[in-house]
Each structure stands twice: as C-alpha cells, then as structure tokens.
C-alpha cells in the first residue's frame, strides 16, 4: 500500500505516494492532466516490492501546492519541480526509471532533456506529441498558423471547466468530470468499480482551476478558431509554440525509451476528439478552414518521427501498443501494461 507523504522541496510542497524498498530500484511515475498520483494506485500495488516507487502530484493537482504555471517555459515548471523532489528524496546521484503518462509524458521528455544522465530508462505512456497539443500539422510539426491558433487554454470546453470548478462529482451531464473520465480516459465500455471510480473523480476535482492553472489564459486570434495560446496555465504549457521537446533527439546519454499506448486512445491519436483540427473536419466545430490549412494533428506520427530520429542519433526505443485500451492502458489493461513496463525496467537496471 502506497503511503502519501508531503515533501517540502526547494520549490514547493509536493504530495508524493511512496511504496517499496528505499534501497531498491528507483522508479518515478508522473501523472497526466486533470488527474493525480491516485491514478497510479493499482499499478503501484502490482509493481515488484523491491522497487522504490515515487508518484508525485504535480503543482496544482492532487494534494500538492497550488502554484501558478508559467506556460512560456512549456512544462519547465513541472520538470524543475520533479527534479527538486528527486533531490529532496536523496536520489539526485542515482539513475532513476522515469514514467510519464499524457501530460506527464511531456514532463518526462523535458526532464530527459534537462537531466539525461539521471535516467536509467524513460517510459512514455500515451504522451503528448513532442510538438505539443493542437495547432500543428504533418509529422514535422509545422504550425497551422504563425500564432499557433487552435491550441492552448482557449480550447478547453467551458462547461467541463465550470463543472470542474464547481466540484461536480455527479453524472447528470456529458461534461461532468465523472462522465468525461469514463468516456475518454478509458475505452468504453470499460468501467471501474464504484469506490475506485469515485476516488479518481475526487482527485480530478482537486485540480486547481483558473488562468494560472487549468485551463489557463488565452489570446484572441484572427485565425480559426479565434483563440491562440496564452502565457499561463496547464493547457498553454502543452500548446504548440510554448511546448517543444524535439531536442530529446540530441540528448547525451540517451536512455532507452519505451512508448506505450492504447490502440483506442481518443485523446492522443491522429484523430483525437480533443483536437480542433479533427473536430472541425467532422463538422463539430464551425468555420473549419479545410484540410490544407488545419488538418487533424498527426500526434502519433509526430511522436514516432521524433523517436525514429532519436534512434538514428544513437538511442533506442520500442513502441508497445496495448490492445483494447484507451488513454489509460495502465488502468484498463494492467497485466499487459505490467509485462511491458516491468520487463523494460529490468532489462535496463
């Protein structure tokens, strides 16, 4: 059973779930957007007991301090927070195995760029594209517009944001966090048992809401869909123009990378239901300027192209696709996920 601790680092008070043997193989788990370390509860209980597993809540999530996010630095705030935790836990001189899920995948890539020698391996679970979320086209991440319109804080669904702020734990709307989790975090008809589902929803509702956190601010744009990324908050930290981890191809040393994704992910895919390019194409967002100007973002193709460059430059990576899973394969298909992840850590320890 993981123990929830609160660690005062040089940057903030960080809540972190801790399990296993402090003298064992160190493993860091970094959660995704609108979630917390609680989403790793089952996984932590299934990992080898001789591993030393740490799963922090990022700033503004879970039980960690609600500090603002400077999106002009991409996910730099989160990556530096993570490094301060590693230092506070006495692991700065020990290579760790770092896993990042979704937003956490972006944080993990930035951490690898900043501290490559500190990683024994890197596992990316349904990660954000190295070119960010929204506003780009083609495998090279070409911007659809110079101001990266179509990404950032202004692209969040306002009804979901309102219900998150209102701490709506019910299910009377498609935009209630509980229903959003069931419909998009997982591949329907997957459902958690009620107690665990409610615990996850409660952790979603701990998300700090506002321009400094979720979703962030916005800048009006003359380009479709009339919003461009702002400078504050979570969605802007992932927005094209602010976020870019392509430099991972040049890091030295190059830890081995395991890329794990579900075969039915609706959030990070080449046809994402959260990408305005795809939503415009299917008629869900009016005024779409067409496939030549704003096609669906090829998120998987972008990630694969960057990882291929990583491999060409002397690194190595594996792509593992988990069948019958959506955006959360570690929850939906824990046995298949464990087999891939545990094998990778053991090979590289």
Question: How would you name each of these model-derived features?
Answer:
Residues 142-302:
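Alpha/beta-hydrolase
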Residues 27-29, 53, 99, 257, ...:
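Hydrophobic beta-strand anchors of alpha/beta hydrolase catalytic cores
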Residues 107-111:
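Hydrolases whose catalytic domains are alpha/beta-hydrolase-1, hotdog thioesterase
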């Amino acid at each position: 059973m993981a123990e929830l601790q609160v660690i005062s680092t040089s940057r903030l008070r960080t809540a972190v779930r801790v399990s296993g043997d402090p003298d064992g193989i160190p493993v860091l788990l970094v959660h995704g957007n609108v979630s917390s370390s609680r989403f790793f509860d089952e996984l932590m209980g299934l990992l080898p007991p001789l591993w030393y597993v740490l799963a922090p809540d990022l700033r503004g999530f879970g039980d960690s301090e609600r500090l603002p996010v400077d999106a002009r630095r991409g996910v730099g705030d989160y990556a530096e927070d993570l490094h301060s935790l590693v230092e506070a836990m006495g692991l700065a001189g020990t290579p760790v195995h770092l896993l990042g899920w979704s937003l956490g995948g972006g944080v993990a890539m930035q951490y690898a760029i900043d501290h490559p020698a500190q990683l024994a391996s890197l596992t990316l679970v349904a990660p954000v594209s190295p070119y960010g979320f929204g506003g780009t086209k083609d495998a090279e991440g070409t911007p659809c517009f110079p101001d990266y319109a179509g990404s950032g804080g202004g692209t969040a669904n306002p009804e979901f944001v309102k219900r998150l702020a209102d701490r709506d734990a019910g299910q009377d709307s498609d935009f209630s966090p509980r229903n959003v989790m069931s419909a998009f975090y997982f591949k329907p008809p997957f459902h958690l048992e009620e107690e665990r589902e409610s615990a996850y929803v409660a952790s979603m509702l701990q998300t700090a809401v506002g321009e400094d956190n979720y979703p962030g601010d916005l800048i009006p744009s003359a380009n479709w869909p009339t919003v461009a990324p702002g400078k504050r908050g979570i969605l802007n930290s992932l927005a094209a123009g602010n976020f870019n981890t392509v430099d991972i191809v040049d890091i030295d040393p190059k830890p081995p990378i395991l890329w794990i994704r579900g075969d039915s992910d609706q959030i990070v895919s080449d046809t994402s239901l959260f990408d305005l390019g795809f939503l415009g194409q299917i008629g869900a967002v009016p005024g779409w300027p067409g496939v030549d100007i704003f096609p669906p973002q090829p998120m998987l193709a972008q990630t694969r192209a960057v990882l291929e460059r990583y491999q060409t430059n002397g690194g190595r990576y594996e792509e593992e696709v988990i069948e019958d899973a959506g955006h959360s394969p570690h929850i939906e298909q824990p046995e298949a996920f464990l087999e891939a992840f545990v094998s990778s850590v053991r090979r590289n320890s």
